[in-house]
């Protein structure tokens, strides 16, 4: 075994109880995210809202982007076929480009906006039409061993 330091933080009972409560709430939320049966329509509705708030300034209303500055999402290989890469880009951003990480969005918001951009502007018909569900985002966040 390697060196495994243990850190103990002593807190008042009230603070500990609040921590336990929050951990339980997180576990319940995670269970709901990973077991809910998400419809494409539900993800699209949420995704459009997230897109309009976070993405439209660069990628434009119809996903056409701005030539030479911000890439189009309409008809792009990533939006048509590369689901895992699409998740990675939103989670990590693109180094050396204007695309920042959006990892501060919730799992539901991320799944919804990715699904929206994979389904809108004819992308569903032109590509694989694969949706992203919150569990896909949870799985992406799991540590890789």
Model-predicted segments: where are they?
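Sequence/structural segment immediately N-terminal to covalent heme-attachment motifs in c-type
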Residues: 40-66, 74-92
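Glycine-centered loop/turn positions within well-structured domains
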Residues: 14, 53, 97
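Active-site/pore-lining binding-face segments in mid-to-C-terminal subdomains
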Residues: 81, 85-112
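Conserved beta-strand positions that form and line the central face of beta-propeller blades
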Residues: 7, 72, 98-101
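Extracellular and select intracellular beta-sandwich modules with Ser/Thr-enriched
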Residues: 2-5
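Flexible coil segments in periplasmic/lumen-exposed cytochrome c-class electron-transfer proteins
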Residues: 13, 17-48, 100-145
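Hydrophobic, well-ordered secondary-structure elements that form the walls
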Residues: 8, 73, 90, 113
């Amino acid at each position: 075994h390697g060196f495994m330091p243990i850190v103990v933080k002593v807190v008042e009972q009230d603070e500990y109880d609040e921590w336990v409560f929050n951990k339980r709430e997180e576990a319940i939320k995670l269970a709901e995210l990973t077991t809910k049966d998400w419809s494409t329509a539900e993800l699209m509705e949420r995704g459009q809202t997230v897109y309009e708030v976070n993405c439209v300034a660069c990628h434009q209303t119809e996903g056409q982007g701005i030539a030479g500055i911000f890439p189009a999402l309409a008809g792009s290989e990533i939006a048509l076929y590369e689901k895992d890469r699409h998740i990675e880009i939103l989670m990590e951003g693109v180094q050396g480009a204007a695309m920042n990480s959006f990892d501060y969005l919730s799992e539901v918001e991320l799944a919804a906006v990715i699904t929206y951009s994979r389904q809108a502007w004819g992308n569903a018909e032109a590509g694989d039409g694969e949706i992203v569900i919150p569990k896909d985002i949870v799985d992406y966040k799991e540590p890789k061993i």
